[in-house]
Swiss-Prot record:
Name of the featured protein: Ascaphin-2
Alphabetical GO biological process terms: defense response to Gram-negative bacterium
Its job: Antimicrobial peptide that shows higher potency against Gram-negative bacteria than against Gram-positive bacteria. Has a very week hemolytic activity.
Upper classification of the organism: Eukaryota, Metazoa, Chordata, Craniata, Vertebrata
Main localisation: secreted
Keywords from the UniProt entry: Amphibian defense peptide, Antibiotic, Antimicrobial, Secreted
Similarity comment: family membership: Belongs to the ascaphin family.
Residues annotated as transmembrane: none
Tissue: Expressed by the skin glands.
Record's GO cellular component terms: extracellular region
Location of this chain's protein in the cell: Secreted
Length: 24
């Protein structure tokens, strides 16, 4: 459903942000 898509996008966003923070 729409909520699952939102959850997936949020998870991916957190992963990307965490990756950027780790690169600093």
């Amino acid at each position: 459903g729409f909520r699952d898509v939102l959850k997936g996008a949020a998870k991916q966003f957190v992963k990307t942000v965490a990756g950027h923070i780790a690169n600093i």
